[in-house]
Amino acid sequence: MYTASDFKKGQPRWCPGCGDHFFLASLHKAMAEIGVAPENVAVISGIGCSSRLPHYMATYGMNTIHGRAAAIATGAKVANPNLTVWQVSGDGDGLAIGGNHFIHANRRNIDLNMILLNNRIYGLTKGQYSPTSPRGFVSKSSPYGTVEDPFRPAELCFGARGHFFARCVATDAQGTVEVLKAAYEHKGASVTEVLQNCVIFNDGCHEAVYNKEGRKKNAIYVKHGEKLVFGENNEFGLVQQGFGLKVVEIGKDGYTIDDVLVHDAHCEDNTLQLKLALMGNGDGFPVALGVIRDVDAPTYNDAVHAQLAEVSAQKKYHNFEELLETNDIWEVK
């Protein structure tokens, strides 16, 4: 039995009010509830404010190079499949210079718990727009507003044939712990997008859902097998309209609870899951929080080790040491 304190280490050096503080506390709690011994866990990050996180974990950890956290985490997991590996990146580190590693880790379905801390800004380098900053966003590197459309992390994950995608808000401790535990339970690559604030360079970037009252009005918590309802009294629901979704008020205009969709996170076809994941950008729909997609599939690391065992069994020499020790050998003293 572990407590959150068993996973704590050091004094976090983030700005007061930074979303990283909230997420770190939830990660400590989630790891305690998961129950894997600290010495069997590795937390691997790239470069950025959020990538300082391994310094504050009493586990194995690596604060590595810019954009390469997923690649290094892949090596760690394949080399030691018994290790529980968490990979932490920000939206800049993970989706700009690290974008290729992000999509290929998902495509290969490596058994990594990938955390994307999304504050829509480069914080460590003092306020440049990131791949998730909205079009028109004014920053130090876009003083007249960006002229680019942003990445939407769910689209990248799903487009790379990802099998697990969840979303939480850093200030929602219970919701964050729940999705982190689900990510751990998933066999294969899991992506958890964490909506968090940057109080210095992008304050209020997720304002609509950053506090409890806002989430009641502007978010929907999705759970497999449950109705897609939301609102302060669950008075609204999502129904299918053609190839899209529609928000309805239950009990009005002929809509009843029976018309409301039931969330299926395990459906291999990701069409409706992606529509849920993309809601909530000023389109009149709520932001979907929780486990949006969770589908089983073979993992890269299992396939690699199975292939090695199969091929090795067919060979005369089963490993490098056996090869070296064949024929005439001698020892130099």
Regions found by a protein language model. Give the residues of each.
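ATP/pyrophosphate-binding catalytic subdomain of soluble kinases
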Residues: 164-221
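Conserved thiamine diphosphate
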Residues: 130-185
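Glycine-rich beta-alpha junction loops
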Residues: 47-49, 119-121, 172, 195-200, ...
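Thiamine diphosphate
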Residues: 49-123
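Active-site diphosphate/adenylate-binding microenvironment
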Residues: 4-65
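Flexible, low-complexity linker and terminal segments
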Residues: 9-10, 200-333
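Short beta-strand segments
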Residues: 44-46, 88-89, 113-118, 193-195, ...
